[in-house]
UniProtKB/Swiss-Prot annotation:
Main localization of the protein described in the UniProt heading: cytoplasm
Protein keywords: Carbohydrate metabolism, Cytoplasm, Hydrolase, Magnesium, Metal-binding
Enzyme Commission designation: 3.1.3.11
Protein name: Fructose-1,6-bisphosphatase class 1 1
Binding site for Mg(2+) 1: 92, 114, 116
Oligomeric and partner information: Homotetramer.
Name of the gene encoding the protein in the UniProt record: fbp1
Subcellular location: Cytoplasm
């Protein structure tokens, strides 16, 4: 019988045998995974736990917070601030970085996260998730105040040392990269551990599925209008094949489908959101997903630029996102430069 490989064993092998990660990064990822387990338990209780519904507050983006948004954010903060692996954390739900309290030791890493992606789907029981990214804290970074600490986070996605997401669906999955391919872990609730169930994930280069919010079609730029119109024409058109559309309105769920069977996900620039730069947040949504997608052989761009090459200007910066099967992403990106 083949012995199960837990997340802890997988990370130990990445550290000991391959030298890909440090001991502190291994421990940090394990702590994040335990926080995701706690979030999964809270979500699973639903109305029985009194965690559904609105929190009665807005986040820094002006979005109404769900009770589970706030709870998930608190779980991640509480789990990670005392372990000695982090210098600071940043979240979609907080205006400024969260500094490690003085009573705890500080480490060399920075953690950014969207504690509960797709939270508008909570009350209708659709898959949601947690997205996270890990960066090295620059030497000599000013962490004296939350305002000063923001500068330490403003690194391009190529600087990420790990990225991942948890999917809270029929099963709870953790999808992870430490820069050595993509691995998928399934939560064994009886053991209370994530078990490796898929390694070296590869996204097909071609696809017949696309994910986009068609209700925004009239606001899209011409290159995306062209690409979607060509897909809708099907095999009689220039792409020569019929496409299916899928849209969950939960980035984690949509991206995980692409990670599993290929496809292209688009939240492109449109005229409604041009002033804010895009819809999705660069630091804790686009960058970690782009790292995962590229590690699995896909591509991720804004339509005009590789996402991982963007130099962030602010913590909550937004960007257009086009990611997934490489040939499809390159096609629509090429339309932007035509």
């Amino acid at each position: 019988m083949t012995q199960q490989r837990t997340l802890a064993r997988y990370l130990t092998e990445e550290q000991r045998n391959k030298g890909v990660i440090t001991g502190d990064l291994k421990l940090l990822i394990e702590v994040v995974s335990r926080a995701c387990q706690a979030i999964s338990i809270a979500i699973g209780k639903g109305g029985l736990g009194g965690v559904l519904g609105e929190a009665g507050s807005d986040n820094v983006q002006g979005e109404a917070q769900k009770k589970l948004d706030v709870l998930s954010n608190d779980i991640l903060l509480d789990a990670n601030e005392w372990g000695g692996h982090l210098a600071a954390m940043a979240s979609e739900e907080m205006d400024l970085p969260h500094l490690v309290p003085h009573r705890f030791p500080k480490g060399e890493y920075l953690l950014t996260f969207d504690p509960l992606d797709g939270s508008s789907n909570i009350d209708v029981n659709v898959s949601i998730g947690t997205i996270f990214s890990v960066l090295k804290c620059p030497e000599g970074a000013d962490l004296s105040t939350p305002e000063a600490a923001e500068q330490a986070f403003l690194q391009p996605g190529t600087a990420q040392v790990a990225a991942g997401y948890a999917v809270y669906g029929p099963t709870t999955l953790l999808v992870l990269t430490v820069g050595d391919g993509v691995a998928v872990f399934t939560l064994d609730r009886e053991q209370g551990q994530f078990i490796l169930t898929l390694e070296n994930v590869q996204i097909p280069a071609d696809t017949k599925e696309f994910a986009i919010n068609m209700s925004n079609q009239r606001f899209w730029e011409a290159p995306v209008q062209r690409y979607v119109a060509e897909m809708q024409v099907g095999k009689e058109g220039p792409l020569g094949k019929d496409y299916n559309m899928r849209w969950v309105a939960s980035m984690v769920a949509d991206v995980h489908r692409i990670m599993t069977r290929g496809g292209i996900f688009m939240y492109p620039m449109d005229s409604k959101i041009k002033g804010q730069g895009g819809k999705l947040r660069l630091m804790y949504e686009a960058n970690p997903m782009a790292m995962l997608i590229e590690q699995a052989g896909g591509a991720a761009t804004t339509g005009r630029q590789r996402i991982l090459d963007i130099q962030p200007e602010k913590l909550h910066q937004r960007v257009p996102v086009i990611l997934g099967s490489k040939n499809e992403v390159e096609r629509v990106t090429g339309y932007h430069s035509a």
